[in-house]
Design a protein with these regions (language model features):
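Conserved alpha/beta enzyme-core scaffold
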Residues: 1-173
Length: 173
């Protein structure tokens, strides 16, 4: 199977309303801006977006937020995106703030087929609210569910027809 597409629009063409997107990047590094623009132009809406953060007010996921295409954002950081902040504070967008390490582990677990795991991170805080908490070896842990996505948008330096990717510099996040 050839996984090379001629452009970002072709690569994103199957993304549909209500899809869950896992979006790479950290701050301004490694953000798949061309793919985000392609999703914006595609017009898919009611998206659940899982990403470390929402970028800034001028780049990254702001293009989907400006168009009101994002229904839910799962992120570890509100950051410097004023649009995201306003939508979050007004209740216009559903937001699940997740500790950064827990976010990474939830994505990893979901990809490995692990439906849930226990972590001490967040016990006794708002993060644990409404979640199962158990004690193991005298220590309390909160249960977190694995995250799976239908599509992943990443920025790579180079790729081959089998889907192997090479990342470079600070984009190796």
């Amino acid at each position: 199977m050839n996984k090379v597409f001629p452009n970002a629009a072709a690569a994103c063409h199957d993304i549909h309303d209500g899809a869950t997107l896992l979006v790479g990047g950290f701050g301004l590094c490694g953000v798949p801006n061309e793919c985000i623009a392609a999703v914006r132009d595609l017009g898919a809406k009611n998206l659940t977006v899982v990403s470390n953060n929402a970028g800034t007010s001028t780049s990254g996921l702001v293009h989907l937020l400006n168009n009101r295409q994002v229904k839910k954002m799962m992120s570890s950081y509100v950051g410097e995106n004023v649009v995201f902040e306003k939508q979050m504070l007004s209740g216009e967008i559903e937001v699940e703030l997740i500790p950064q390490g827990t976010l990474s582990e939830r994505i990893r677990a979901g990809g490995a087929g692990i439906p849930a795991f226990f972590t001490p991170t967040g016990v006794g805080t708002l993060v644990a609210e409404g979640k199962e908490v158990r004690e193991f070896g005298g220590r309390r842990y909160v249960m977190e569910r694995g995250i799976t996505g239908e599509f992943a948008l990443v920025r790579a330096f180079r790729g081959d027809r089998f889907g192997n990717l090479v990342f470079r510099k600070t984009s190796r996040n």
